[in-house]
Amino acid sequence: MNDRRDDYRDTVFLPVTSFPMRGELRRLEPRLLARWAERDLWAELRRKSRGRPLFILHDGPPYANGHLHIGTALNKILKDVVNRARQMAGFDALYIPGWDCHGLPIEWRIEEEYRAKGRDKDAVPVVAFRAECRAYAEKWMGVQGEEFRRLGVAGDWADRYATMDFPSEAAIAAEIGKFLLSGALYRGLRPVMWSPVEKTALAEAEIEYHDHTSETVFVRFAIDPARTGRADLSGVSVAIWTTTPWTIPGNRAIACGAGIDYALAHIDSVELGSLARPGEKLLVALALLPEFCAATGIATHHVEHVFKGEELAGLVCRHPLAGHGYEQSAPIFEGDFVTTEQGTGFVHIAPGHGEEDFALGQAHGLEVPDTVGPDGTFNAWVPLFAGLHVYKAAGPVMKALEDAGTLIARGRLVHSYPHSWRSKAPLIFRATPQWFIRMDGPENIRGKALAAIAETGFVPARGRTRLASMVEQRPDWCVSRQRAWGVPITVFVERRSGEPLRDPAVMARIVAAFAAEGADA
């Protein structure tokens, strides 16, 4: 047996470098970063890049509200790779980092500190609260900036920007002023996604969808013979289905589909425990009648007549809580959004709690009742439910309907439902006066955005279709928030008429004040 141990190192062609065998990054990375700083590598790159074509990476800034997490780090590292690659490809990759310092995430953190200390936010002057938000954001900008530098992200960290810097606040006010002067900024009453926990409207980007179990109800709306003039429909009720029983107090109408077939069903017998009544007559979409009977415990029935939806439009029903403080009627209107996918083929319309409800109500001059306050509780003037929170209202509303004899059935549905990305609480649609920017009209923001999307390269290419679809369908942009920490909408409004003041000189004075003293000026 040969014990000789051959050394083959000299026979293998390997590169020779000064790199150590071990990375020892914990020890060596700080040295490397210190050497970059000592050389002022960023300034050196800028000097060597003079005259090159610029490459600007438009970076959505992070929130200054805590240590970096893996998502923030990955986002910034990938962008750093892009910038470095373009720099080495012959461009001047000028990257100026920044932070989003306004808005709910930071305000929510300050409120959490208040709650932990038993402080009442409402007792704190707004300017003092804003100062605390500013100090909090300033602190975390410093922390995050050091963490980004520790990751090796190259950028002009000495000249960073922040949305709370006075020049930034002035620029935001100036842009809002342009929309005001052009007429694109307007104040309107409209249902928006509302967070009862944060007491504010939320943007689409602030909304998450999670599975949620909702209470559902089938409710009968009795046709009012005195208002209808249809003897053949005496004693007939329209059946509706909703996943938001708490919106019943805000009902002002019913929608039907013009081309949908509706069965006038005579109930012959019901199962034990059903709230349906033998002998009653209900109007339900013909295609949904079997599902309706199964869900409501109707054992047998027969169809007396089939109507088209257009024949039912114009009928008037009583509110299901009539006699209990709800004496308003519920007329039936055609709605192009009504389908036979689920429910009864009729849609209960609460103009203050849904986009389609609101639009139909506006088209027919319906009032928009103010039933729910900013904190999600029914207002004092709402019969039966004043002071009750909408999250807890399903049971009491169903009990009131049952006592009134208008509840047909109840159930539960697990479905995807909007939640606040910050509080994780369910949201509601709530009609409130808000400030909007028109997507259409003379400014043609939608058209300009779609044209820009068409001219932009997307990787992957399907991103263009997705973004264009979102822009095509989005309603006017709600820019107002009912919060303290942000750039205020700088509009003076005539107290009696509500008409905004559109004066370029006034707007210029506001912008100058913001530039000098910030939004607290």
Residue ranges and their predicted role:
Residues 253, 260-346, 355, 359:
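Protease-associated
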Residues 22-53, 294-297:
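Histidine-rich, glycine-flanked metal-binding segment
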Residues 96-98, 263, 491-494:
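Hydrophobic, aliphatic-enriched repeat segments that assemble into extended interaction scaffolds
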Residues 89-90, 294-299, 365-366, 518-519:
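Structural alpha-beta junctions
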Residues 47-110, 172, 240-248, 255, ...:
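N-terminal catalytic cores of NTP/NDP-binding nucleotidyl/phosphoryl-transfer enzymes
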Residues 2-18, 22-25, 31, 35-39, ...:
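Residue patterns forming the tRNA-binding/recognition surfaces of aminoacyl-tRNA synthetases
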Residues 53, 215, 328:
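Residue-level signal for beta-strand positions within conserved beta-sheet cores that form or flank
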